[in-house]
Amino acid sequence: MKVRIKWLENVAFVGESESGHAMVMDGAPEGGGRNLGPRPMETVLIGTGGCTAYDVVHILRKGRAPVTDCVVEIAAERAPQDPQVFPRIHFHFIVTGRGLKREQVERAIHLSAEKYCSASIMLGKTAAITHDFEVREAGYEIRDTRYEIR
C-alpha cells in the first residue's frame, strides 16, 4: 500500500491514495491552518472507525444478521506532551437492524477488535482501547440498550 502526501500551503496537505482518492488535511486557524479538512490525527481515528465498521457490517451480513445501519462514535484522549499519542480510545457502536441479537453484535465487534481490524489492533499496541455498543430496532429512534464489552 502506498500513499502520497503533498504540501498545499501553510499547514494544509493533500493525501493521495494508491486507489486514486484524495483527502485534504489542515490545521486549526490558531495553528496556521484554514480548517480546510480534518487534522491528521483525526484521520487516524476516521480510518480506524471505517476499518472496524466495515468489519462489523461484513461479519453480521456474512452471518445473515438483519443489519440495516452501523455507526461508530470514537472518543480519544490525547497525551498532553509530545508526541501527543492516544493513550485511551473508546469505540461506541450503534448497530441497527430488524431483530438483531445482542450476542451477534457483540461477537462481530469482538472479532473486529481482536482479529480483523488492522488499524485498531495497531493502535491497541500503544493505547488502552475500550468498546461498548447499542442495538437498535430498525424504524425506531429510541436507544434500546447500551452494552459494555468485557
PLM features per residue range, with description:
Residues 1-46, 57-150:
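Extended beta-strand/beta-hairpin segments
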